[in-house]
Amino acid sequence: MIGCALALIALAGCKTPELSMDERISLPESGEMGMNDTTFVKPLSWDVFFQDTLLRGYVDVALRNNHSFRQSMERIAMSRAALQRAKGLLLPDVNLNIGASVNRFGEYTMDGVGNSETNVPSLPKDKHIPDPYRDFGLSLSFQWEADIWGKLTRKKQAAAARWMASVEATRFAQSMLISDLAIQYYELIGLDRRKEVLRNALASARRSHELTRQLKKEGAETQLAVDQFYARVLSIESKLLENDQLIGEKERAIACLLGVFPFEIRRMGFDELRKLPVPLSEGIPANLLTLRPDVRSAEMELIASKADVIAAKAAFYPSLVLGASGGFNAFD
């Protein structure tokens, strides 16, 4: 009885801890406005959303040359290789071994003396051990682990989920790259428009300053008014210099995103840009959350983590491994 009790205690101690897998949280079926509209916002690709042909060309260049985006593409290849490896765990491991060796026995060694005593005249010539001794071998073996606890299947599921997560992460990187490029491009157009406005303001300020200076000569204005308009001219000139500096920074930022140096940033005019249509879809924008690549990537990572937990629990159980081997061995 004491032995049985100790065995039960040992079995209870080897039991893996129970993990709660239920993370469901009750959420309201609709928002505060009570919208039950099932209309889904159709996602638009970037080449449809952006009507500017120059911006489209920049996006194409960025997707080909941006270093960060190319790294994310390589991570997809790494995840795909890990998935292929996980699939291979469910298949038998087959090995083919072909070997050849040459051994020369020393005259005053145990092997040398033993072989000289073994090669007696009464032994057939083809059974004598030669010196040097050439050995040849050919063998075939296989080993297969039965997936009785689902450990290997869960590993494959985790690898597949991580591959999908890397795909979604790459889509997220693409979305961020395109949005950053579009923001820099449109801000650059805005700076061009600001430069045009400042130039017009500078011309107007210079005319006002000259007019005030002439009026002062006639005694109709004071030196204070002349100095005020001159200060206005200097202020606008400083803003123009600052604006030119910002334009240079934006151009360098776009070139950095494109991965091409140096690069002349051609852009559309502000008035031309205003005439371009903006394609929009009808529906509830909140529904697009289900299509966000960062959300889907996090969901895939959660699925992979759950599969890893189940595989780790199954690793505590005994494994069933089947194997066999056979081959030929001879010497000359």
Task: Label the model's feature ranges.
Residues 55-57, 78, 135-137, 183, ...:
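Transmembrane beta-barrel architecture of outer-membrane proteins
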